[in-house]
Amino acid sequence: MDLGLRGKVALVAAASKGLGRAVAEELAAEGAKLAICSRDAEAIESVGNEIAQRTGAEVLARAADVARTADVDAFVDAALSIFGRVDILLTNSGGPPPGRFETLDRAAWQKATELTLFAPVEFARRLLPGMKERRWGRILNVTSITVKQPVDNLMLSNSLRAAVTGWARTLANEVGETGVTVNNLIPGYTRTDRVVELSQVIAKRDGITAEEAVARWEREIPLGRLGEPREFAALAAFIASERASYITGQSIAVDGGWIKSLL
C-alpha cells in the first residue's frame, strides 16, 4: 500500500535508537525526507548515514537536547533551512526516571516537565504555523500506556504524559479545520533501552532478575511477548500518511493488548 509519503519532510526527535529510530527508518523507506536529532552527536550522525545509504533518503542529522528550547529552535531552523518545510512532526524523548512520589523533589518534576511536556509544545509552536499555512500536517506524540493505565513507580511518566495527552487532544480540536491532525501513539512494553532500564529497576526492587521482570510483563500481555520497535513504527507511518487524514485527537496503543480498559 502506497502511503503517499514520498517527498514529505518528517522531523523525528530522539531518533538515534529505539522507537524514534524505528519510525525514522520506516518513514525513509516510504520515501520521506528526514530531519532527525539526538543528544548523542556521533550516534545520530551514524544513524543518519546508515538510513541514507540504505534507503536513498535525504537525511539531516543534528545533535539536540529536546529539553532545551535553544536546541529545539536550532534543530528546527536547520531543518527549515535545508528542506524549506516540515510536514510531519514526531515528538519523542526518553521517558522520565522511575520513582514514587516521596522520592521526587521539585527539581525532578521540573526536569521531567521540560523533557516530557515542554519539548513537544516547543516543536509544535515552531512547526504548526507552516503546516496550517499549507493546510496539511501531521503531529504525532510518542507517549505511553501509562496514560490509559498508570504503572506503579512511574509517578513522573504517569502524570506528565497525561498532560501531553490533554494538550494534544485540545490542539487537535483547535487546528482540525486547517488540515492538520494531532495524535498520540502509545507504545506498550517494547524491546528498547527504556524497557531494559525499567526491568533492571524492578529486578533490584523485587529481588529478581531482569529476565524475570520481563517474563512478568509478558504474562500480562495477551499476545505473550514484548513488542518490536518496527511494529510501532508501522503504525506511526500510517498515522503520518495521507491514508490517515480522518484520524485526529486519538491516543492509539501498540501494546499487545496490555491495556485492559474499554476506551
Region locations from a protein language model:
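Short, small/polar-rich loop/turn modules that mediate ligand/substrate recognition or access, typified
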Residues: 90, 176, 181, 247-249
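Substrate-binding pocket helix/loop in short-chain dehydrogenase/reductase
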Residues: 100-101, 105-113, 139, 217
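Short C-terminal tail/terminal secondary-structure segment
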Residues: 149, 237, 248-263
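Conserved glycine-rich Rossmann-like NAD(P)H-binding loop of the short-chain dehydrogenase/reductase
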Residues: 30-47
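Conserved glycine-rich cofactor-binding loop
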Residues: 9, 14-17
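Catalytic loop of short-chain dehydrogenase/reductase
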Residues: 140-164, 168-177, 189-190
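Alpha-helical segment proximal to the catalytic Tyr-Lys
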Residues: 129, 173-174, 245
